[in-house]
């Protein structure tokens, strides 16, 4: 039996549950920056390239001639225009940027897909996932082992059913991606919140009190004095996390904590790209308007000199 999938699950569990006593565990799912480059169009469009293509694929376009960049960009426009009406809206551009930024997620799913799709039908059923991940562990458990594989499987099945939109217990690649990376999908946010609350709620009342909140982040382990950040977290809980000041966090308060709806970098970047490229100011972009501003969207050797990088043909 292949033990790698279960070891991956256990590895993630251990990483989430074990930490140094004074080390803060962060459960917040942050909206990541689109690029580590400075966003200053007066200097260059490197930030925009990373946002539109993803950092790795932006390097590819740096090695193309202007003509090649325009040709490939034109092909990409067809993928962004989801309703095929000949226009790219801010919403479609936002969706594309989010997808480009999630490329690492999809790459991770691709690496695992063949291992779980045992029947090679382009789908992964719950039975396939269960058999590959758990297999004989469910039948041959050490009673002295405190880790409950059956409970872990029940939790996985619940998440699988949530990701499986049509309820047939068979996941498409997109549904399987939502199962493996629920924090990346809006319709999976409730399960992320539920699993987090189950992890932290030790007394089983369905809520998170102050001591449970702190206990999840910090293990006293005989420390005489709490680190300063622990005191700060106590204040954060009482003043901001517990919005109704009843001493506990409910589902909505927990959601606001771990899935903050702050600044959306993808939406901001799509507005910026439309503003800079929309010649007739109708609020949407044609293929011609985008290709005309190819240096803003993707760049080329003519706009980005320097790095000697390996060229590939992903797009």
Curated annotation (Swiss-Prot):
Chain span(s) of sequence motif Prevents secretion from ER: 312-315
Recorded hits in SUPFAM superfamilies, A to Z, give:
EF-hand
GO CC, sorted alphabetically, is:
endoplasmic reticulum; endoplasmic reticulum membrane; extracellular region; Golgi apparatus; melanosome; sarcoplasmic reticulum lumen
InterPro entries recorded for this chain? EF-hand-dom_pair, EF_Hand_1_Ca_BS, EF_hand_dom
User: In this protein, which residues make up the domain named EF-hand?
Assistant: 68-103, 104-139, 151-186, 188-223, 229-264, 265-300
Q: Give the record's glycosylation annotations as residue positions.
A: 131
Annotated binding of Ca(2+) 4, by residue: 201, 203, 205, 212
Q: Molecular function (GO) terms listed?
A: calcium ion binding
**Keyword Glycoprotein set for record:** yes
Where is this protein localized, as stated in its record? Endoplasmic reticulum membrane; Golgi apparatus; Secreted; Melanosome
Secretion signal span: 1-19
Keyword DNA-binding assigned to the entry: answer is no
Sorted alphabetically, the keyword list is: Calcium, Endoplasmic reticulum, Glycoprotein, Golgi apparatus, Membrane, Metal-binding, Repeat, Sarcoplasmic reticulum, Secreted, Signal
Which annotated residues bind Ca(2+) 5?
Answer: 242, 244, 246, 248, 253
One Pfam family linked to the record: EF-hand_8
The text of the family note is:
Belongs to the CREC family.
Q: What is this protein called?
A: Calumenin
Recorded name of the encoding gene: calu
């Amino acid at each position: 039996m292949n033990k790698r999938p279960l070891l991956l699950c256990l590895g993630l569990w251990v990483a989430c549950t074990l930490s140094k006593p004074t080390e803060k565990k962060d459960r917040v799912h942050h909206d990541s920056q689109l690029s580590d480059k400075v966003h200053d169009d007066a200097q260059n469009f490197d930030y925009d390239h990373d946002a539109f293509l993803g950092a790795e694929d932006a390097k590819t376009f740096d090695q193309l001639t202007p003509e090649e960049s325009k040709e490939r960009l034109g092909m990409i426009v067809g993928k962004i225009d989801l309703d095929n009406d000949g226009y790219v809206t801010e919403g479609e551009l936002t969706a594309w940027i989010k997808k480009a930024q999630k490329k690492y997620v999809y790459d991770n799913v691709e690496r695992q897909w063949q291992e779980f799709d045992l029947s090679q039908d382009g789908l992964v059923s719950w039975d396939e996932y269960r058999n590959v991940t758990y297999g004989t562990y469910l039948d041959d458990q050490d009673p002295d082992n405190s880790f409950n594989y059956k409970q872990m499987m029940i939790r996985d099945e619940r998440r699988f059913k949530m990701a499986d939109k049509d309820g047939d217990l068979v996941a498409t690649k997109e549904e399987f991606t939502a199962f493996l990376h629920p924090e990346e999908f809006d319709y999976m946010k409730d399960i992320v919140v539920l699993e987090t609350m189950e992890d932290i709620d030790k007394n089983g009342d369905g809520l998170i009190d102050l001591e449970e909140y702190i206990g999840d982040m910090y293990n006293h382990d005989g420390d005489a004095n709490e680190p300063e950040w622990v005191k700060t977290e106590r204040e954060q809980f009482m003043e901001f996390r517990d919005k109704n000041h009843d001493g506990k966090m409910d589902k909505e308060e927990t959601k606001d904590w771990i899935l903050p709806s702050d600044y959306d970098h993808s939406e901001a970047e799509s507005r910026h790209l439309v503003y800079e490229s929309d010649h007739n100011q109708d609020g949407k972009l044609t293929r011609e308007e985008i290709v005309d501003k190819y240096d803003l969207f993707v760049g080329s050797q003519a706009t980005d000199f320097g790095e000697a990088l390996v060229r590939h043909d992903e797009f």
